Amino acid sequence: MSIVNLSSYHFATIEDTAAWRPFVTERCNALGLKGTILLAPEGINLFVAGTRENTDAFIHYIRHDALFEGKFVDLQFKESLSDKQPFTRMLVKLKREIITMKKPAIRPELGRAPFVDAPTLKHWLDRGHDDQGRPVVMLDTRNAFEVDVGTFDNALDYRITKFSEFPEVIEQNRADLEGKTVVSFCTGGIRCEKAAIHMKEVGIENVYQLEGGILKYFEEVGGAHYHGDCFVFDYRTALNPQLEPSKTTQCFGCRAVVPPQAQESPLYVAGKTCPECHPDSKAARAA
C-alpha cells in the first residue's frame, strides 16, 4: 500500500493558535495521519502522511472546516508517494514563526511575496535574462549542507547554517543583487517566500520567490539549469529531478549528507561512520 506524503504552508493571520491545536490534533489522529503541523500567528506549515483516503479527507478538512474561517480554502499541497510511513508520530506544535528568521512576524494581510512559476523561470534562465532584459540571479536560501546536495547553476550560496542568518548575509552582500532580478528559492517555498518578503522590506528591488520551490520546479519542468538532487527532511534524504529518491543518504553516526561518491570511500561504513566522522578522518584533520 502506498503512503501519500503531503506538505504545504500558508502565511495567514491566526489570532489564537492554542485554541486550534486540540481540534487539529484530534482530527489528524482520527484519520491515522502522522507528521508535524506548525501553527504560528503568521500561518501554518505542515508535513503529514497517510493513506490516500485519509489524506484526501485531511485536505478537505483544512480547506473547508469552519474552524479555519476560510483562511486555507485555496491551500495547495505538494504530494509524493512512499512505500512506508516516513513519520513515527503526529505532532501539532505552536510556534512564534512557521519558519524561524528571528525578525518581526510576516504580516499576511499585506499580501504574499511576488513569485515566478517554474515554466517562466526556465524561460528566463534559457535566455539569461527576464522579460525586461535584466540579468537573473538565483539566490539559495537553504542551509549549506542542503546546497551541497544540489542547487541551480551559478546560484548565490552564502553558506548559512540556519535560516535566521539570512537577514545578516543579505545586508552584507546587497551589492550582489543590485540591478538584477533576484529569484529566491528553497525546497518547497516557505523559506524563499519569507526571504523574498524580507528583501522587499529592506529595499531590494525586483525580487521574486520561486513558486512552490525546487520540488514544484522539478514537477513542472524537470532538472533544467539545476545540478544534483534536492535534500528533503525525511527518510528519503534526497530526490532527483524526477522526484524519485536518489542514492544520497545520511550518516547514521553524525547525520552528515553522504552522496554516492562518498559512499565509495573506505571511511564510509553503512550504519556507523562516514568520511566526516570516521576516526581516521578526524585524526588526519587534527594532524
Curated annotation (Swiss-Prot):
Database matches in Pfam families: Rhodanese, UPF0176_N
Domain of life: Bacteria
GO biological process: tRNA modification
Keywords, comma-separated and alphabetical: Oxidoreductase, tRNA processing
Regions crossing the membrane: none
Active site, renumbered: 186
InterPro entries documented for this protein: Rhodanese-like_dom, Rhodanese-like_dom_sf, TrhO, TRHO_N
Enzyme Commission number, as recorded: 1.14.-.-
Gene3D superfamilies: 3.30.70.100, Rhodanese-like domain
GO molecular function, one term: oxidoreductase activity, acting on paired donors, with incorporation or reduction of molecular oxygen
Keyword Oxidoreductase: yes
Residue span(s) of domain Rhodanese: 132-226
PROSITE patterns: RHODANESE_3 (PS50206)
Function (record text): Catalyzes oxygen-dependent 5-hydroxyuridine (ho5U) modification at position 34 in tRNAs.
Family: Belongs to the TrhO family.
Protein name (Swiss-Prot/TrEMBL): tRNA uridine(34) hydroxylase
Organism: Paraburkholderia phytofirmans (strain DSM 17436 / LMG 22146 / PsJN) (Burkholderia phytofirmans)
Designated gene of the protein: trhO
